């Protein structure tokens, strides 16, 4: 399994998480999942400044994002604006 954000490959005892629903289901390593989860919580709470901060952090981590990850991020961006 490979992280859809940073491209990290799963090794023995590594945790990977599945996020999203429908067409935009993505697999994330634990570090990327933590930041992505914070983005979703910021979205629910209406915290635009924190959302932008976590989005920037996730963008820095995204060395080789997949198309599914980009689609998932665009869906979140459309909800905040």
Locate each region found by the language model.
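N-terminal cationic leader/targeting segments used for protein routing and processing
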Residues: 9-10, 26-28, 64, 80
